[in-house]
């Protein structure tokens, strides 16, 4: 590499500090995380470390804007912003599936909230192998136990859309969603939407508390443009504000009492009171 060359990675979840240990100029190393499908999602996360060279950051911003993408600068941390916020959304979907809630019902709850696709279809789109890898990185980093293992499906080559079958079978690049059984029709939790959405909101608060991103408006924009999060709701933080901060916290506390500590409100909520 040339003396002043910049090296960039498209990693979706690994801390940059773990990837740059053998570089002669680690301060010239940066993350440029694009989102799939690249042609449809305009966001690029620009990942920096505490000591990343300012010229490197400016060059990354210049590159991203020149290719007509939207840059979101965030601090190196497992999952960065978007994947960290998405992870509990997909995890809760797997837990609901384990409780024999129909896959279609899970996806419908999210779509009715305003998400572009449901979490089950999203896992199939991302690829079960990739989702499993990201989940493992985040679980190790944040001491979260794996509540649903994708390994059996991965071993059977059911990786999602790219192999023709994951949670759904895929025909002509579209998922075939089976109708819920009679028992599953009776088994749709009243709080299914909150169980899917509020963990994302809680994780967004954690990202702000840890200063992974500078402010809530940037975070909301990043989540909307990186995931398609119900745009009319303004992003996860704006959704909480519109719903009411105290009301949102109370809803999380209620879910925590019913389902366990994964719903425990993050201490960062204190900054919103």
Task: Report each predicted region and the residues it spans.
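N-terminal glycine-rich phosphate-binding loop for ADP-containing cofactors
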Residues: 1-273
